[in-house]
């Protein structure tokens, strides 16, 4: 902000918070089943991400079907190297696949999405991985990249079309997770 202000002193600045759209989620959707003090004292809860995208897509869908956004119940998907799903009821986010961080949820280009929370403990114990290494593994070496060695969906689709089993698996795992979230939001 300071650099932009120095470089463009006469240009208004606007801050957009990617999590803001998800602030309408009910407590049952944003709270984790962990001790209450972790939420109250440390803010450990689900925040969601890609809110600007989900809000735009929801409003655009409402326009296309000719219905006020506030009367729409929708499931929106943000699909790219980062990916998320959001349930919208009456124009408000009521659930989303990403949690406290973007790591939770759908399979992404390099992020694993949902996994058993004990997997990092297992990897730490059996492989001696520290927190920094685990964070890098789950955020930057997993997802599509971890499943098939590539995080470009166009290349993965091409490889799958050519019979590459790892690429087929990556597409299958991604589709399974998408169907799981969409089904939960119906």
Residue ranges and their predicted role:
Residues 1-15, 19:
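Conserved phosphate-binding loops in N-terminal lobes of ATP-dependent enzymes
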Residues 3-6, 56-64, 119-123, 133, ...:
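Alpha-helical scaffold segments in soluble metabolic enzymes
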Residues 10, 64-71, 126-132, 160-166:
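Short, glycine- and charge-enriched coil/turn segments that flank and shape catalytic ligand pockets
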Residues 19-22, 141:
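Short glycine-enriched loops at secondary-structure junctions
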Residues 23-126:
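Glycine-rich phosphate-binding loop of actin/hexokinase-like ATP-binding domains
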Residues 48, 52-56, 83, 114-118, ...:
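Conserved active-site and cofactor/substrate-binding residues in soluble primary-metabolism enzymes
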Residues 71-77, 132-141:
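Beta-strand segments within the central parallel beta-sheet cores of soluble alpha/beta enzyme folds
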Residues 136, 140-149, 153-186:
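Adenine-nucleotide phosphate-binding core of ATP-dependent small-molecule kinases
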């Amino acid at each position: 902000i300071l650099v932009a202000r120095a470089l463009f002193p006469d240009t208004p600045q606007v801050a957009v918070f990617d999590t803001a759209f998800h602030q309408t989620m009910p407590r049952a959707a944003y709270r984790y089943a962990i001790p209450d003090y972790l939420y109250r004292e440390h803010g450990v809860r689900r925040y969601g991400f890609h809110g600007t995208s989900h809000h735009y897509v929801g409003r655009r869908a409402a326009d296309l079907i000719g219905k006020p956004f506030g009367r729409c119940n929708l499931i929106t998907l943000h699909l790219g190297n980062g990916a998320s799903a959001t349930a919208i009821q009456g124009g408000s986010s009521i659930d989303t696949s990403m949690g406290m961080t973007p790591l939770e949820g759908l399979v992404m280009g390099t992020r694993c999405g949902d996994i058993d929370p004990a997997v990092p403990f297992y990897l730490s114990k059996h492989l001696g991985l520290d927190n920094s290494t685990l964070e890098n593994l789950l955020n930057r070496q997993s997802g599509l990249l971890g499943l098939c060695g590539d995080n470009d969906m166009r290349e993965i689709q091409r490889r799958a079309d050519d019979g590459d089993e790892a690429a087929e698996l990556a597409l299958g795992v991604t589709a399974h997770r998408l169907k799981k979230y969409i089904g939960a939001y119906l």
